[in-house]
């Protein structure tokens, strides 16, 4: 049984990328007397099955600043900690098939310029030059983020954990929070199956468990986990040939009106649809023993997105499916994860 400290300035609950990043940033701000509690293994909730995209695009100035900060941090975090985060700045192309969509991109370009995020506008022919497996039919243009791309979420989490530990933070895995109570002096008691911790602050980063965590302090946290699927395909000889010839990795391709993204993965492709009306899950919270959990895939639910992807990228129709990931992602009422 691992000994657990009895006091801390901050207790962070939840060992996904959000919780471990919070711990890392507290240490970087000079608060070394901090710890994190994770009921299972780090990343074992939603982080492990995330596709890891780094979308700089956001119409909000404040959220856009966070996205820019995050991408820049990930670029240097591996060197800082010695833990590779798997960042791939392969770019991101957002397609426009109508003027309303292009006007949205033009409006965003003003936000991007204010933030200091580089964007480019492409003609349909330029899209195909960069992403040769895409068809330009129906396109009026596109917007490209040259510095966008993806990261490996589990590796990123481990880099944050290493940086936090090096700064003095403690991480307690396989430790379950059983209660949170505010004491008469304003301090908090976090009760776990390995002992109690008295602390000044508690930070909940519990994802799909957020409602259960909130109930411990009398809060109704408006978070609903929903199912989110993405498809990983078998490899394709033409994609493998590109890599063998030393050509650059295909960037992230987004069909905004079709509500999907696609990127290269191990000689094949990943298709990530954003389903309208995706079913909610964990309505009563995940099982206490839930770890690295996936749900049964539902390809029929994805067919409109698959058909749209086949139209835009015909080789997608030729590819066998290697794996369908269907995992929980926690959403709030404003639609943001």
Where in the sequence are the language-model features?
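Beta1/beta-strand and adjacent pyrophosphate-binding region of the FAD-binding site
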Residues: 4-18, 35
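Gly/Ala-rich phosphate-binding loop of Rossmann-like dinucleotide-binding domains
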Residues: 23, 27-28, 163
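Glycine-rich FAD pyrophosphate-binding loop
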Residues: 27-48
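Dinucleotide-binding Rossmann-like beta1-alpha1 core, especially the glycine-rich loop
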Residues: 52-130, 257-262, 267-268
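Short beta-strand to alpha-helix junction loop
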Residues: 65-68, 95-104, 144-165, 172, ...
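Helical element adjacent to the flavin cofactor pocket in flavoenzyme catalytic cores
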Residues: 143-201, 209
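Central helical "cap/lid" subdomain
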Residues: 196-249
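Active-site lid/adjacent beta-loop-alpha segment flanking the redox-cofactor pocket in flavoenzymes
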Residues: 220, 237-337
């Amino acid at each position: 049984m691992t000994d657990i400290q009895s006091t801390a300035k901050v207790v962070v609950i939840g060992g996904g990328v959000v919780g471990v990043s919070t711990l890392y940033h507290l240490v970087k701000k000079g608060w070394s007397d901090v710890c994190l509690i994770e009921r299972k293994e780090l990343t074992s909730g939603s982080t492990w099955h995330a596709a890891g995209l780094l979308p700089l695009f956001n119409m909000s100035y404040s959220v856009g600043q966070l996205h820019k900060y995050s991408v820049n941090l990930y670029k240097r975090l591996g060197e800082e900690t010695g833990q590779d985060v798997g960042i791939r700045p392969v770019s991101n192309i957002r397609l426009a098939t109508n003027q309303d969509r292009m006007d949205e991109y033009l409006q965003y370009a003003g936000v991007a310029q204010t933030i200091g995020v580089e964007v480019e506008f492409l003609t349909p022919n330029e899209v195909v030059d960069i992403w040769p497996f895409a068809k330009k039919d129906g396109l009026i243009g596109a917007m490209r983020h040259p510095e966008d791309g993806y990261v490996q979420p589990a590796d990123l989490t481990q880099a944050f954990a290493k940086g936090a530990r090096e700064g003095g933070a403690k991480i307690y895995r396989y430790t379950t929070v059983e209660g949170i109570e505010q004491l008469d002096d304003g301090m908090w008691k976090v009760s776990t199956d390995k002992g109690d911790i008295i602390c000044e602050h508690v930070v909940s980063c519990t994802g799909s468990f957020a409602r259960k965590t909130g109930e411990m302090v009398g809060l109704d946290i408006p978070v609903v986990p929903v199912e989110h699927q993405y498809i990983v395909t078998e490899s394709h000889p033409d994609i493998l040939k590109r890599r063998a010839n030393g050509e650059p990795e295909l960037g992230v391709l987004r069909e905004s009106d079709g509500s999907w993204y696609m990127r290269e993965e191990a000689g094949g492709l990943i298709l990530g649809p954003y389903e309208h009306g995706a079913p909610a899950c964990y309505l009563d919270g995940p099982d206490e023993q839930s770890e690295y959990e996936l749900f049964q895939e539902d390809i029929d639910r994805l067919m409109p997105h698959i058909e749209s992807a086949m139209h835009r990228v015909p080789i997608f129709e030729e590819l066998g499916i290697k794996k369908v990931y269907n995992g929980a992602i926690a959403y709030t009422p404003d639609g943001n994860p």
